Every structure is written in C-alpha cells, then in structure tokens.
Amino acid sequence: MRSESGFNRRATAVLAAWTLVALLLAGQAWVAGQVRGEPLAWARASGIWIVWAAAWAALTPIALQLAARFPLQRAHFFRAIAVHGLASVACALANMAIFALAAPVVGATQLEPTWLGTFTRLLGTTFILNVPVYWLVVAAARLERLARTAREKDRLEAQLADARLQALRAQLQPHFLFNAL
C-alpha cells in the first residue's frame, strides 16, 4: 500500500510533468503564431494547452493503474495490449470531451456552435494525436517499473555479497584463533 506522502509525491510529479508539457507546447504554439504572422497571445496559448494537459493529468492515474494491473509482459501480452488499446481510445475521447467543454472558455479557435460539433471536429483532427499520449504514459510506467526492479535486484545482490562476506569471515576467524593458541 502506498503511503500518503508517496501518493502526494507522485501526484505532484504528474502535475509538474503535465504543466511542463503544457508550457512547452504553449511556447511552440506561440512561436509558430509569430512565425506565421498570426500572433497568438501567450495567455491564450498557455490556457489552451494547460486545459489539454490538465485533462491528461486527470487521466494519468487511470493509465498508471491500468499499467500496474495489466503490465506489458510476455505472460499476458495480448490481453494487456487489448486492455491498453481500449483504454487509450477511451482516454483520448475523454480528453477531447473535456477539451471541447473548456475550449470556448480558453479561447480556442475553430469551434463549432455546439459541444458535439466541437467534439466531432476534435475527433477528426486530434484523436490520432491523443491516442499515443496514453501509450507514452504506459511506457513511462513500464520504464519506471523496470528501473525499480533493477534497483531492487542490485540491492539484493549487494546484501547477498555482504552476507557471503560475513559468513566467510565467521568461518575464517575461528581458524586464526585456533592456530594462534
């Protein structure tokens, strides 16, 4: 069971990571607007990308739970792929639904008069870009798990080496005492 401080640390890391992604994408959108001669206000660019990233930040714990429950391992690989495939579609749709709801508030462009119209437009333009985001979260969780396993293996190997050294010392020490007498 994860401690509360561990949960807070992980939640803070998720929020910080998604905030960084939002700011990087907002910066890219702002620069692209300047280059095209279509200036985009920084507040508007950052608002748009913060909403997108906040939706993914809210969806990240779901992806992490699924990554832990259905790890991409040889034993049940196809089942895990199926679960994550469905989850990636569901999370992408959820992200677009949240963004379609918030888009008018943050000043997103190319909106339709209705939420459904905006959602449909997003479905056609950003769905294929949102699906891999889920897979990146799952891949990051997998890499973290592999790193944690490697650290644990190294720790156990160090303990084993130390135990062997202590056992060897215990075996050698009586012989020296006996020979000294």
Where are the language model's segments positioned?
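N-terminal sensory and localization modules of signal-transduction and trafficking proteins
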Residues: M1-A82, M96-F119, A150
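Alpha-helical transmembrane segments of MFS and MFS-like solute carriers/permeases
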Residues: A13-A17, L86-A87, T125, L181
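Generic alpha-helical secondary structure signal
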Residues: A57, P61, W135-V138, N179
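Hydrophobic alpha-helical transmembrane segments of integral membrane proteins
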Residues: A57-A58, I128-L129, A170-Q171
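Solvent-exposed, charged/polar functional surfaces in cytosolic regulatory/catalytic domains
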Residues: Q65, R142, L146, A167
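Cytosolic coiled-coil signaling helices that couple upstream sensory modules
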Residues: L86-E157
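Histidine-centered phosphotransfer motif of kinases
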Residues: E157, A161-L181
